[in-house]
Amino acid sequence: MTERMKKIIFKNLIISETEDYIIINKPPGISSLHDWSSETTIITMAKEYTEDPQLCHRLDKDTSGILVIAKNPEAYRNLAMQFEKRSVEKIYHAVVEGIQDIEPIAIDRPIYTMSKGKVRIDFQQGKPASTLVKPGEFFKKHTLMLCKPVTGRTHQIRIHLSSLEMPIVGDEMYGGKQLYLSSLKKK
């Protein structure tokens, strides 16, 4: 466990809380569910905070964003059904390399899961995957892309953007380079 993970206090992640749900801002670098490489996960921290927490959805370990945790089985079923029926609109923001002045597109490329959680585009063995993508804002050497996954495959947005030579900055697993704040100047 890194020093950074030791310092995370679950209560400080909470954006909103009701009798049924806890809404948190998940930081990058921590798994939502159990992870063989780390004992600290969002769900283990939530179990110390409330009696019966259940994740209504998940975010990849290195992804930050809003995460909803149900406090009881009925609340979980209610929101899980909304996710299953795709009535929840999910939009991810990703800073990618280069100026991507493109029209909105649908990336339809099948994804195959390899060992150790990495994925690749594979037209023979992959499972169908679709992501809607459009540019949001332009910087000097980067573009903020707005991404809406139609399917929910592991690392879907990361591999789809990388497959079009638009790797997410900092995502070294799929070809992204480290980002320095000085390079995020407005175009």
Which residue stretches match the model-derived regions?
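Beta-strand-rich interaction surfaces with strong enrichment in secreted/lumenal proteins
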Residues: 134-135, 146
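RNA pseudouridine synthases
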Residues: 1-130, 136-139, 161, 182-184
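Pseudouridine synthase
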Residues: 39, 140-187
